[in-house]
Amino acid sequence: MSVLKEFKEFAVKGNVIDLAVGVVIGGAFGSIVKSLVDDVIMPPIGLLIGNVDFSNLFFVLKDGAKQAGPYVSVAAAKQAGATTLNLGLFINALVSFTIVAFAIFMLVKAINRLKREEAAPAPAAPATKECRYCLSAIPEKATRCPCCTSQLD
């Protein structure tokens, strides 16, 4: 079998296509969550804390060789060659990760619940026999009929 044909069989399998779709949707979901955190959630939190812009919350560890601080933004510090600890960007990434992890947890939890419902076997019908005197259905191991009280063999 040629390498091209083997690759085609591998690529067309359902699992590979599902994985590719998952990666694309995951990337899109990640960018939506990043925008949600950066543009919707963190600005009000920064306002409540005291007019803090988390995207520009940083500490200068070492001034830049091109220009000494203070720097108005992370971009200005990086342009000057300063070494910075970007705490605000880390907080934004942490909030984004928490939202994505919680969404994935809820999705997996729902899928597992559906799998358990599918996998639950139907309860087996009780083994019964017919009473030869009154013809009612009685348990297989019964020695006396509960309906007519006849002694069974």
From Swiss-Prot:
GO terms for cellular component: plasma membrane
Location relative to the cell: Cell inner membrane
Stated name of the protein: Large-conductance mechanosensitive channel
Subunit structure: Homopentamer.
Source organism, top-level taxon: Bacteria
Transmembrane segments: 16-36, 88-108
UniProt similarity note: Belongs to the MscL family.
Cited HAMAP family: MscL
PROSITE patterns hit by this protein: MSCL (PS01327)
Function: Channel that opens in response to stretch forces in the membrane lipid bilayer. May participate in the regulation of osmotic pressure changes within the cell.
Pfam families in alphabetical order: MscL (PF01741)
PANTHER family: LARGE-CONDUCTANCE MECHANOSENSITIVE CHANNEL, MECHANOSENSITIVE CHANNEL MSCL
InterPro entries per the UniProt record, alphabetical: Mechanosensitive_channel_CS (IPR019823), MS_channel (IPR001185), MSC/AndL (IPR037673), MscL_channel (IPR036019)
GO MF assignments: mechanosensitive monoatomic ion channel activity
Record keywords: Cell inner membrane, Cell membrane, Ion channel, Ion transport, Membrane, Transmembrane, Transmembrane helix, Transport
Membrane topology, from the record: Multi-pass membrane protein
